[in-house]
Amino acid sequence: MVVEDTPKSIITDDQITTNPNRVIEDDNNLEEGEILDEDDSSATSKPVVHQPHLLENSWTFLFDTPAAKSKQDDWGSSMRPIYTFSTVEEFWSIYNNIHHPGKLAVRADFYCFKHKIEPKWEDPICANGGKWTANYPKGKSDTSWLYTLLAMIGEQFDHGDEICGAVVKVRGRAEKISIWTKNASNEAAQVSIGKQWKEFLDYNETMGFIFHDDARKLDRNAKNKYVV
């Protein structure tokens, strides 16, 4: 598949760098009167060891396919984990080798959640939470999805401990990106997350926050409790 050009990321290039230190022979090893020539082939160098850049949290990509969902009665039972990553390098290795939202089939759901948190209302960490949602025309969410991932795994939110994960849902005429949080009743934290997310995405439309409990009881009739 063709990998899209990666836009300027929140995880900066200097976080993925090589070790500039080059080990050469110590001056004490020179013969008396010998001058060390830096280009001298006798100057030995050791291979550079690339240290992985650890993330503060481990994250898991999960995928729910349209075909699998049509065969299951219970919501979420067809969801499958793809890969759990804990370093910057692992993230890019996965991201650059998977389809982005614009290439996913209609009715596909693609998740990135903190490791061991399931993107389900029944998960004890998600149970009292809610979600912010940004809406996009079909095929227009790729860049915002990447920026959302980078903001989360790069711990760019002031209330990052409130975040469970994010999901992009591909539908017939639209794509929706949502950020799930833990404590819906913590208005200050939720509004802060919503405002920062809008800023990261340069999103100009209104965003709404729905409590999971309302969505569970009212389904499509659930109303926004917070807006930014």
From Swiss-Prot:
Tell me the outcome of changing residue 5 to E: In strain: JI 1405, allele resistant-1. In strain: JI 2009, alleles susceptible and SBM1
- By its UniProt entry, which InterPro entries does this protein fall under? TIF_eIF4e-like, TIF_eIF_4E, TIF_eIF_4E_CS
The effect of residue 180 to A is: Resistance to pea seed-borne mosaic virus (PSbMV) and altered translation activation
| Membrane-spanning ranges | none
Per the UniProt entry, the effect of residue 69 to A is: Susceptibility to pea seed-borne mosaic virus (PSbMV) and normal translation activation
Tell me what effect the entry lists for residue 169 to N.
Answer: In strain: JI 2009, alleles susceptible and SBM1. In strain: Dark skinned Perfection. In strain: Bonneville
Q: What is the effect of changing residue 122 to A?
A: Altered translation activation
Explain what the record says happens when changing residue 62 to W: In strain: JI 2009, alleles SBM1 and susceptible. In strain: Dark skinned Perfection. In strain: Brutus
**Outcome following mutation: residue 107 to G:** In strain: JI 2009, alleles susceptible and SBM1. In strain: Bonneville. In strain: Brutus
Instruction: Give the consequence of mutating residue 215 to S.
Output: In strain: JI 1532
**What molecular functions are annotated in GO for this chain?**
RNA 7-methylguanosine cap binding; RNA binding; translation initiation factor activity
The protein's UniProt keywords, in alphabetical order, are: Cytoplasm, Disulfide bond, Host-virus interaction, Initiation factor, Nucleus, Plant defense, Protein biosynthesis, RNA-binding, Translation regulation
Q: How is it modified after translation?
A: According to the redox status, the Cys-126-Cys-164 disulfide bridge may have a role in regulating protein function by affecting its ability to bind capped mRNA.
Q: Which residues bind mRNA?
A: 71-76, 103, 121-122, 171-176, 216-220
Q: List the disulfide bonds.
A: 126-164
Mutating residue 63 to A: what's the consequence?
Resistance to pea seed-borne mosaic virus (PSbMV) and reduced translation activation
The answer to whether keyword DNA-binding applies is no
User: Effect of altering residue 206 to A?
Assistant: In strain: Dark skinned Perfection
The effect annotated for residue 170 to A is: Susceptibility to pea seed-borne mosaic virus (PSbMV) and normal translation activation
> Quaternary form?
EIF4F is a multi-subunit complex, the composition of which varies with external and internal environmental conditions. It is composed of at least EIF4A, EIF4E and EIF4G. EIF4E is also known to interact with other partners. In higher plants two isoforms of EIF4F have been identified, named isoform EIF4F and isoform EIF(iso)4F. Isoform EIF4F has subunits p220 and p26, whereas isoform EIF(iso)4F has subunits p82 and p28.
Briefly state the protein's biological role.
Answer: Component of the protein complex eIF4F, which is involved in the recognition of the mRNA cap, ATP-dependent unwinding of 5'-terminal secondary structure and recruitment of mRNA to the ribosome. Recognizes and binds the 7-methylguanosine-containing mRNA cap during an early step in the initiation of protein synthesis and facilitates ribosome binding by inducing the unwinding of the mRNAs secondary structures. Key component of recessive resistance to potyviruses. (Microbial infection) Susceptibility host factor required for viral infection by recruiting viral RNAs to the host ribosomal complex via an interaction with viral genome-linked protein (VPg). Also seems to be involved in virus movement from cell-to-cell.
Name of the protein in its database record: Eukaryotic translation initiation factor 4E-1
Q: Which organism is it from?
A: Pisum sativum (Garden pea)
Q: Which gene encodes it?
A: eIF4E
